Amino acid sequence: MVSTDGVAQGPGVASRVWYAGKRMRLEAAEAPAGPALILRLDLGKAWRLDPDRKVATEVDADRLRSRSQMDAALAGDLMGGAEEGRVRTAPLAGLRRIAGYECHGFRIRGPSVVMDLYLAEGLGLGIDVFADFIEWSGAGQSMGALLAEIRKLRGFPLQTRSRVVVLDRVHETVSTITKVRVGPQPRAVFEVPAGYRLVVETDEPGKE
C-alpha cells in the first residue's frame, strides 16, 4: 500500500511469492493461474510467463538490474541511505502478531527516511534472504548504510513500513505478508512449464 500525506494512492497490490534458496516466483494474488515472474538468482536468469499465449519471455538479468539500480539510486539519494554514520536503529516496544508469527519491531532512521521492520525468527529464514535479494536487484549500493543496518537484524521481515519526505511531502509504503506456508516447494514452480514457447526480451516495442 502506498500513500502520500496520509492519502492512499490506489487500492494496493496483493501478490503470491514462492521462495526456495535462490529461486523465487511471483504472481498476482487475484490471478493465481495468470502471468508470473520466475527469478532464478542461482542462474542469473528471469522469465515472464504468459499462460494465455503459452510464452516464456527471458528477461535480460543485467538490464533488469540496471533499471533497478537507476530507480534505487534516485530513491537512495532522496532517503540519504548511502550516508555512513547518519543511519541509526532502535527497537520498537511490544510484539506484533503477523501471519501467525510473533514479530519484534525495529526502526531504522536516516536523514529523510524512517523504516519500521517487524521480523519473525520462527520461519527458518534470516534477514540475509531479504538483503541478498536487494543486493541482486542492484539496489544495495545506493542504499548503503541503510542496507548495512538492515543486515544487523535477526529474523525475516513480515512487515516493512517506510516513510520518506520529499519536497515537504510524506510518502509512505507498507508491505505486509499475510500468509506463510513453510515446507518443500515443487521444482516445477521455479521452472518454465513444458510446452511454452521461449522468446528473448528485446528493446523494440511490440517485438520479442
Residue ranges and their predicted role:
Residues 1-208:
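Extended soluble regions of mature proteins
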